[in-house]
């Protein structure tokens, strides 16, 4: 028989840097999960990624206090900021442009995020990423 799911916990944790301090500790402690066990497993799974990159993770907590987790790709905004070489997006994206990204960079980001995005073709995913870039005050160059 399948295990009974107690809760789903969604967090963003820096790759390779999970530790029992907030936000990880309180969120998992509330569910009665062994926090250090999660931290070790998460850090092991994300050691190949760039250290400090925020990684969305969905933790499934079962009634017997065991857990499984799924890591996703970093948010598009984080990848766009990295590609454009900026610290943060524009406060007024329609007026103040803070950087530029090329269509090739948008394609690479869309391919990276392909598994986590909806849309059938890479072109539709590129349009979505380009829209995110524009809403951050980035100019998408051909």
UniProtKB/Swiss-Prot annotation:
InterPro entries linked: Ribosomal_uL11 (IPR000911), Ribosomal_uL11_bac-typ (IPR006519), Ribosomal_uL11_C (IPR020783), Ribosomal_uL11_C_sf (IPR036769), Ribosomal_uL11_N (IPR020784), Ribosomal_uL11_N_sf (IPR036796)
Gene3D superfamilies membership: Ribosomal protein L11, C-terminal domain, Ribosomal protein L11/L12, N-terminal domain
SUPFAM superfamilies: Ribosomal L11/L12e N-terminal domain (SSF54747), Ribosomal protein L11, C-terminal domain (SSF46906)
UniProt GO cellular component terms: cytosolic large ribosomal subunit
Keyword Translocase among record annotations: no
Keyword field: Methylation, Ribonucleoprotein, Ribosomal protein, RNA-binding, rRNA-binding
GO molecular function, one term: large ribosomal subunit rRNA binding
GO biological process: translation
Family of this protein: Belongs to the universal ribosomal protein uL11 family.
HAMAP family documented for this protein: Ribosomal_uL11
PANTHER family assigned to the protein according to its UniProt record, in alphabetical order: 60S RIBOSOMAL PROTEIN L12, LARGE RIBOSOMAL SUBUNIT PROTEIN UL11M
Protein name: Large ribosomal subunit protein uL11
Source organism per UniProt: Pasteurella multocida (strain Pm70)
